[in-house]
Amino acid sequence: MKVFLIRHGQTDQNKRGILQGSVDTNLNETGRLQAKLLAQRLLPLDIDQIFCSSMKRCRETIAPYLELKPEVPIVYTDLIRERVYGDLEGMNVVEAKKLLNANHPDHYGEGLSHLTSRLLKFWDEYVVPLQGKKKCVIVLCHGGVINVLRTHFMEEKGFTFDKSKLESKIITFNTSITEIEVTEHGTGHIHTFGDASHLESEETGKLIA
């Protein structure tokens, strides 16, 4: 079974470098365009099931695809909402990282262990039962969520991956796709990290971001 972990489209806060966390923001104009390009990217796939964060920026990202394929079942869930960052929310990302580095990461908002438990609860309750039964599943969520799941799969569950793809820093672009293949026994292989090729402009070759 293939599982595509997809980040939401761009928001004004993303563009300005503001940490959103649990703040329920909308897509901006660029984000809405990214969502339409993502829909075209997903259209050829035979998608069995979609799981989507209940936050607006994720709902708005998957909406163009659902307009084209309304028959695909979707579940909106709080379990894959972005991490709660407490007092850091609304701050510049660079400044927020300085505070995180200066203090214990769990000092602000939702602790990493709690976040990981929440995400694994989602995986165990929603994704694991589909292993060996479905062929293609979409998980539309957040950058922080994808990073935690990816790290857990690589370091704790032993999912294999092409190490050459990790030679440079992984950037989880807006609407980028991380493709994972999971067997019915729970083993897996990560095929792509943050693939945003659908955002490449035909005129400039640069990402629409």
UniProtKB/Swiss-Prot annotation:
The keyword Ribonucleoprotein does not apply. InterPro entries: His_Pase_superF_clade-1 (IPR013078), His_PPase_superfam (IPR029033), PG/BPGM_mutase_AS (IPR001345), Phosphoglycerate_Mutase (IPR051695). The keyword Nucleus applies. The active site is at H8, E82. Its EC number is 3.1.3.-. Its main location: cytoplasm. Keywords: Cytoplasm, Hydrolase, Nucleus. One of its GO terms (molecular function) is fructose-2,6-bisphosphate 2-phosphatase activity. Disulfide bonds: none annotated. It is found in: Cytoplasm; Nucleus. The record marks H142 as: Transition state stabilizer. Transmembrane segments: none annotated. One of its GO terms (cellular component) is cytoplasm. GO terms for biological process: positive regulation of pentose-phosphate shunt. It is an enzyme of class 3 (hydrolase). PANTHER family: FRUCTOSE-2,6-BISPHOSPHATASE TIGAR. Belongs to the phosphoglycerate mutase family. BPG-dependent PGAM subfamily. This is Probable phosphatase C1687.21.
